[in-house]
């Protein structure tokens, strides 16, 4: 499968190997694509950019966002810094982690120096000194990004918490930055709370792909995401009018929580297990009926899930939540716009039918694209 770029950073829960499954349920031609839990950005980096579509990468991890910004805007400086920083042992790994811990102090020092320049100098002298400080700040951002990258690359499965014992030659991966930098030129990069940006960017023509920390596996992530946060995420997504796709681990709690969504399941090899042949259950959850987009070999009937099979395991009794909310919005618009008639009822809007096949938005006639902006002959293979 030919993609624009590959992830340049190892990341716990990376979806690079799952792209063939997730892209199958992508509706074509959204006007906005958002990843609120950006992580390694495997899906977004692999998508063809499109003038008519805004792509947004978001993550709450400020170090990760800084790395993506530097990869886009300071690629040459970042690669040079990565070649310079030594990295051969646990001691160097721990030293880089210690540097990351004190980044706030270094940022505060730069801010204090800037304030001193503003107070003590004026005119051309002030501007010259401010430019020096701006360059120093950019250099610090690059140094910080390089340190964070090496901590990720040197840790077990990209967790950033424990040192990986395998030999790791950073220079073998630097070529990934070239393509990633070009792809990110067309991407808006944000550092916001996942729920806030979903609320901000939801719309009828939006496609939002969520890859939250997996339930009961939060200890593997560098962010606190308790059970209540999973429930809050579901609450927000259940009220969205855009196309929502969510990836999760297969467990009873998530199946129950998303009982009002369509749920597809499959099994994959488990890279975190030390047992040969170990597999892991995955869910792909949507607020719309995914079947019109999926390739013919997809199974629409609940069955014993073999490794690699994509199976629809749950269909909500109420039908598509997205269609329900779109109809509700249309109903309210008709009701507000229509004049009051002789019968005394304002705006006889269409009756909502939660169990119907949804609004006439052409979903059933659309052809699956893999991904939406790539031709069918690129559907085979994996990244």
Which positions does each model-derived feature cover?
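SAM-dependent nucleic-acid methyltransferase catalytic core
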Residues: 2-18, 28, 72-218, 235, ...
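An N-terminal domain-cap segment
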Residues: 4-51
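Conserved proline-anchored active-site loop of SAM-dependent methyltransferases
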Residues: 22, 33-47, 57-62, 68, ...
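SAM cofactor-binding core of SAM-dependent methyltransferases
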Residues: 31-98
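Short, polar loop motifs at secondary-structure junctions
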Residues: 39-41, 176, 248-252
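Short loop/helix-cap segments at secondary-structure boundaries that form the rim of catalytic
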Residues: 47-50, 200-203, 253-260
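Long, positively charged, glycine-interspersed low-complexity recognition regions
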Residues: 226-331
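Mixed-charge, low-complexity intrinsically disordered regions enriched for alternating acidic
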Residues: 337-383
């Amino acid at each position: 499968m030919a993609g624009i770029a590959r992830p340049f950073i190892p990341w716990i829960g990376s979806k690079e190997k799952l792209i063939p499954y997730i892209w199958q349920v992508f509706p074509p031609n959204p006007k906005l694509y958002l990843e609120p839990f950006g992580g390694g950005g495997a899906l977004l980096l692999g998508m063809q950019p499109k003038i008519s579509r805004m792509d947004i990468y978001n993550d709450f991890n400020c170090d990760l966002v800084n790395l993506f910004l530097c990869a886009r805007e300071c690629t040459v400086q970042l690669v040079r810094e990565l070649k310079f920083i030594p990295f051969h042992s646990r001691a160097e790994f721990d030293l880089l982690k210690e540097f990351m811990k004190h980044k706030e102090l270094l940022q505060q020092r730069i801010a204090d120096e800037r304030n001193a320049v503003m107070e003590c100098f004026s005119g051309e002298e002030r501007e010259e000194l401010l430019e020096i400080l701006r360059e120093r700040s950019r250099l610090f951002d690059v140094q910080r990004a390089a340190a964070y990258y090496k901590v990720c690359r040197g840790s077990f499965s990209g967790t950033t918490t424990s040192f990986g014992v395998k030999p790791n030659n950073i220079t073998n991966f630097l070529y990934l930055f070239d393509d990633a930098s070009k792809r990110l030129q067309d991407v808006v990069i944000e550092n916001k709370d996942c729920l806030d940006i979903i609320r901000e960017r939801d719309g009828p023509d939006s496609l939002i792909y969520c890859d939250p920390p997996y339930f009961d596996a939060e200890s593997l992530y560098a962010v606190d995401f308790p059970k209540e946060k999973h429930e809050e995420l579901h609450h927000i997504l259940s009220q969205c009018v855009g196309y929502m796709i969510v990836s999760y681990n297969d467990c009873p709690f998530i199946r129950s929580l998303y009982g009002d969504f369509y749920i597809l399941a499959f099994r994959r090899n488990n890279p975190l297990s030390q047992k040969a042949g170990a597999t892991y259950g995955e869910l792909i959850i949507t607020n719309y009926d995914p079947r019109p987009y999926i390739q013919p070999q997809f199974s629409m009937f609940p069955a014993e899930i073999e490794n690699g099979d994509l199976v629809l395991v749950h269909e909500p009794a109420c039908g598509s939540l997205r269609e329900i909310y779109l109809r509700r919005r249309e109903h309210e618009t008709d009701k507000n716009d229509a004049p009051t008639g002789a019968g005394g009822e304002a705006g006889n809007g269409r009756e909502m039918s939660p169990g119907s096949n949804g609004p006439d938005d052409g979903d059933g006639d659309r052809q699956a694209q893999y991904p939406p902006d790539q031709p069918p002959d690129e559907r085979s293979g994996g990244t």
